[in-house]
Amino acid sequence: MNQDNFKVSVAICTFNGAAFVEAQLESILAQSRSPDEIILCDDGSTDGTIDVVKKISDKYPDKIKIFQNERRLGSCRNFERAISLVTGDLIFLSDFDDVWFPEKVATMIRVFAEDPGFVMAYSDAVITDVELRPTGTVFNRRKDTDLRKTPSLQQLSRGVAFNGPMMAFHSRLKPFVIPFSPLSLQWTHDHWIGYIAYAVGKIGVIERPLVYYRRHGKNEGGDAEFDGGLLYQWRVVKKKYQGSEEYGERRRGWEDMVTRLHEIRNGGLPLSNPAKLDKLLQVSELCLQFAKARQMHKTRGRLARAPSALRLLFAGDYHRYARGVKSFVQDLLIP
């Protein structure tokens, strides 16, 4: 398919991003291959984000459409809304605080033009500080996100293999991924999309960075994955997991994924690799069983839960479906 025949949409979500959103929108508008539409959904910003955006959108009224949520949806649901509103063949996701390389859109379009079997294109990114000073690349700094090597199914299930600003996906993926699981503790929007994309089609990997991924302490994503400090990672873990209810959300998140994969398999929509879907479904069902076991032993006191946690550790489940010893220690120590 000719590259010019694709309609390109950008789904961008904002929340109190006045300090960064102008630079991001300018980088999108300055693409060597300009997107055809930009759908921006704001989740109740109170810092003047909308004023900044409107100054830019007034110059491009036919390209930029702004939607303001009547109530806060949260990042995952906000992206679900934005994706449901786009009308393009290819969908690019954008956080409000990153900056795209000028050739990002053109480079990622080529993946789909050269092979119609691809449902997603995925690139590397340059990690930066708040002032866009580079500190490394995602593929080199974050072990489980380097898609240059085919990830194991267990690696995908651990939840860190996909980052929204690094992906573009074909619109034929929309009926598979929407609606999202409502339990964002288990599934961020990008992990949900990437996991299902891997199940139903092919992902084309671009080995060079096409976006600056800005870290500033308020990112929606999992910054702990980039930080080597054990104390920092422990604080993040302790903040995220505080009791059996959170583990219940993770269990229900895996129930949502297993249900969705069964619906896809039985729904009659064309798949490029049904065998791969079946394998990922099997792994997802094992992840669900593991999540149920973790939830069960978290309802007990620390000493009482130790035997069941040790059984999971020695069986290898913590390494297959979680983060190994880190998750084991987390389950023992956090109430």
Identify the meaning behind each predicted range:
Residues 69-86, 151:
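Glycine-rich, basic loop-to-helix element that forms the pyrophosphate-binding segment
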Residues 104-136:
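Conserved donor NDP-sugar-binding/catalytic core segment of glycosyltransferases
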Residues 91:
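Short aromatic/hydrophobic "clamp" motif used to bind/position activated sugar donors
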Residues 17-30:
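Short, well-formed alpha-helical segments that are part of the catalytic scaffolds
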Residues 84, 149-229:
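Conserved nucleotide-sugar donor-binding catalytic segment
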Residues 42-51, 71:
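A conserved acidic beta->alpha catalytic loop
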Residues 6-9, 37, 192:
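Cell-envelope/extracellular polymer assembly enzymes that use nucleotide-activated donors
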Residues 266-335:
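Membrane-interface aromatic/basic loop that binds lipid-linked glycans or pyrophosphate carriers
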